[in-house]
Amino acid sequence: MKIIGCDFHPSYQQIAMVDTETGELREGRLEHEQGEARRFYQALQGQTVRVGIEAVGNSQWFEQMLAEMGHELWIGDAAQIRRLVVRQQKTDRRDAKHILDLLLDGRFPRLWVPSQQIRDVRQLLRHRQKLVELRTQVKNQLQHLALNQGVRRKRRLWSVQGRAVLEQLPMQGWTARRRSDLLAMLDRLDEQIGELDRAVRAEAEQRPEVRLLMTHPGVGPVVGLAYVLTLGPTTRFPRGKQVASYLGLIPKERSSGGRQSFGPISKQGNTMMRTLLVEAAQTAVRFDEELRRGYGRLKAKKHSAPAKVMVARKLAVRMYWMLRENKSYAQLYAQRPVARM
């Protein structure tokens, strides 16, 4: 069997490979664009090969190539791999050898890797989220133009009447051109986001677990689908608290000398999922008494931002238990008035 530690970069990779039968070690650098890496792995076809890399961006082509060749790929948690480094000197060669050592010692922090189909649907959600953020930027610019003309409508600016007022505001030359272009962009973005929303609803309807999550107040097709595709199998997480930690919703902790202090949330994990959960939490507190009480208490002590995050964390844990126990919101809430951690 060939075991390969790979320090992956956009244009090249450094490898450390060992043959478990002979003990022979081979190290080298493989360029990507010239096809050197492809030729190297092609030469290993027909043999049992396991490759380990850190979780990095822009590696999808490499993952697909190894799958086509029949090689096994393990993707590891980059932060944990770095924490296991003993030496302070960092080079590509040492990084590749370090990954190889973790693979050989059975200490490689392997991550769950979603299927290509799941990754593709994730692109749908990510594309929608980016367009929503872009639409928000366009709306903010239009609000600024209206404020410069003494018009302050906030959300009412996007009603039929508000839009008419905005279009009729007296503006000169390039200011009027900017307004016209921004309105055209807004219309186009609304159309594109609407199309993506329909695609998200269609994907959500095909998945029973997403429909189950949508029984919880505040959880719609976007949040439910993103949650299922981000979390993967719930069996990966023995406890709800681990889900909150995985999503970066647990406060940072510093404990030393018997003193324990907590800071802001870690913000590790999927940024889009955290954003969606916070947005869903703001709706959930309007319909769920327990969440509303918790939100009110923390908001009174601190302010609304940490209160929203707290509700998002509780919501994430609730959704986890709904999936684990295959229970709807009504069934789960009746059994557990307090969300389990």
Report each predicted region and the residues it spans:
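A detector of single, family-specific signature residues
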Residues: 1-341
